[in-house]
Amino acid sequence: MTKKAWFLPLVCVLLISGWLAPAASASAQTTLSLNDRLASSPSGTGSLLSLAAPAAPYADTDTYYEGAEGKTGDSLKSTLHRIISGHTMLSYSEVWNALKETDEDPRNPNNVILLYTNESRSKNLNGGNVGDWNREHVWAKSHGDFGTSKGPGTDIHHLRPADVQVNSARGNMDFDNGGTEYAKAPGNYYDGDSWEPRDDVKGDVARMLFYMAVRYEGDDGYPDLELNDKTGNGSAPYHGKQSVLLEWNKQDPVDDRERKRNEIIYEKYQHNRNPFIDHPEWADEIWP
């Protein structure tokens, strides 16, 4: 028998018996969708480090941020402001449906994930009663007194679903470390003038505030929003605490949930991006 004659039957036997199946299986595993990876990861966070295959980039961000690379300080801040300004603005009522998509539970499409508690709650329970979720302004809307009209008050890059009672407890506090644990939201702490969110969203909070401080510079009829290193800012257009936010940006890296949310906002709703999700290192370049 020739070598070719006995080799082909042997390959067939190996395929049938499953000896070559692992290679095919491994190849198939790399085709999992982002939703599959999010749903299968702990708490749906889906860190890139925990994925067997890295997530493909969403958009051509090199083109989007053209002109920003290599800049630092005020030059970088002003360039990013120009890039992300002029976005499509939603009404406050339109925010409800947007959040139902941007913050959808990857394990249950009928629910949203609440920011401070990580609870999955029905999309239909949006409102103002106990047991409902409502629209949390991460940059407190009293800090600059911009309310809920189109603009910073409806910018979904910093609006997130939150339990009504937890949202009320946070109020308009600045962000800082320490305080007493809030019983209705374990892992969150508060004192007289500050709120500390749970560890898994500390970076999310920081990057949302970085975005707001770059997007709203007072040149388009909206307040000039700025970070500072204080708490108790009240109605001034400032939010703190800058040094703590920079620490949180490093402690809680960007995850796939943030990336997916950023992409949905860019593609479907506002058509602008949060630069600090795409390039978290830029925060230290602007606020050294």
Swiss-Prot record:
The keyword Protease does not apply. GO terms for molecular function: DNA nuclease activity. GO terms for cellular component: extracellular region. Residues 1-26 form the signal peptide. It comes from the Bacteria. Keywords: Hydrolase, Nuclease, Secreted, Signal. InterPro entries: Endonuclease-I, His-Me_finger_sf. It is found in: Secreted. Its EC number is 3.1.-.-. GO terms for biological process: DNA catabolic process. PANTHER family: ENDONUCLEASE-1. Mg(2+)-activated ribonuclease which hydrolyzes RNA apparently nonspecifically into oligonucleotides with 5'-terminal phosphate. This is Extracellular ribonuclease.
